């Protein structure tokens, strides 16, 4: 689903990467979620094989870029999209990815608050949560915050 979505998407693609340092366990997130993950420049940090190639191989010449996010949501993502919107108004934003119930919901609500007039779409077939129950709860939360869950 994800690869097909990327291959057929006709706009700019921004990959966000959960990005932590080796001292992750010393930070609040690491203390509350003591599972080292997405440590910069390790295997678990890289975008899944084939997805970058799918984005770069599209016939549409739209930019592909990356945002390293140190926590659940990314202010850098919001700032970048605000800048893009000023240059060329954004018609809509589509979010896909992992984890629906942590990063996707955090970014969706932040983007909706920062760019309230731009429709925020969530393709639920291209998302997954920690559990099915928490995935569904996140989708419901995003719907309640006026995101369009498909």
Which role fits each region the language model picked out?
Residues 18-20, 72-73:
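Short glycine-enriched loops at secondary-structure junctions
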Residues 4-12, 31-150:
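Active-site-adjacent betaalpha module
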